[in-house]
Amino acid sequence: MMSGTSLDGLDLVICDFIKKEDWTYKLLKAKTIKYNNYWTQTLENLHKKNKKEIKKIDMSYAIFLANEIKVFAKNHRIDLIASHGHTIFHEPEKNITLQIGDGEKIANETKIITVSNFRKLDVSLNGNGAPLVPIGDLYLFKKYKYCINLGGFANISVKEKNKIYAFDICPLNIILNKYSRKLGYEYDYDGIIAKKGKIINQLLENLNNLKYYIFDNPKSLSREWVEKNIYPLIHKKYSNEDILRTFCEHAAIQIGKKITCNTALFTGGGTYNSFLMKRIEHYSKSKIYIPDKKTIEFKEAIIFGLLGVLKIRNEINCLKTVTGAIKNSSCGEINKPF
């Protein structure tokens, strides 16, 4: 179960995971639950609230998740729930990360063992607590040198021999969806709005010169970073269409720089933005592969299922080469129902 920073909705999957020589999976069912206006507004603004209000929403969101699971998983025997929750704070440099959707509450409401709070341990080990998906790229999507997810942030995992490293490339749908909503749309379907806009050269230059892009890996981004570094660059005089056009170009440049050979697997909601994908192709030297619709939309949720399975087996599911932690770990907290 996965909820991303782009606030597209709640991704639910039911999977069988099989371990022989390698890990494989079978996707049995998948669905995205669109957030209503209450949850969209609540999740977008919860970081501004006090601790008491956040705790209250933590519990009510857990009940919401549990109810959705009970409906979604009806007639299926579920051994384990792996819940990412929804990120409210993520500032690993301050040793802070918070994903709401209390795992104990979900377990008690559903009567199913629940693994949650996947980022906390890695942050305590001086890691970024992100990205967590690369272990799944390594185990389930071995044949692709690059795996790129175009979600709230564009992130990448890169395989070299039997090793993998990963990082967030740049903000993406967290920006594109915000400025699409200002125009009355949930998102920029097919990049139609961006395509109508013009590139703001000064903004593009300022974006491309952000210090984050010269930092060494591992590194990760957050909503807090976006608020401090991106929004101050966007003047009120700029039209939303031009902002979208400029940001598409910026993202394409940054993503294209990172994929220079072999085949790149693209997933996530941004993959449906054909204008963005064409701009990425323009800047990239890799062969771009776009999989089936369910893999595009549910790859991250599938991998969080694997993270939960690895945790229950007490196996490594978080890699220090990816997060910068002092050691590999088995992240997540196991909650058994009363």
Task: Annotate each language-model stretch with its function.
Residues 88, 262-283:
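Glycine-rich phosphate-binding loops at beta-strand->alpha-helix junctions
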Residues 16-68, 74:
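Glycine-rich nucleotide/cofactor/substrate-binding loop typically near the N-terminus or early
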Residues 283-303:
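Conserved phosphate-binding/catalytic loops in two-lobed NTP-binding clefts
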Residues 187-192, 252-253, 273-286:
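Extended, folded domain segments that form the structural surfaces/walls around functional sites
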Residues 78-79, 145, 262-264:
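Conserved acidic residues
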Residues 5, 9-33, 162-252, 261, ...:
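Conserved ATP-utilizing enzyme core subdomain
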Residues 49-103:
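Short beta-strand-loop/turn "lid" adjacent to the catalytic site in phosphate-handling enzymes
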Residues 1, 92-97, 104, 108, ...:
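Phosphate-binding/catalytic loop of phosphoryl-transfer enzymes
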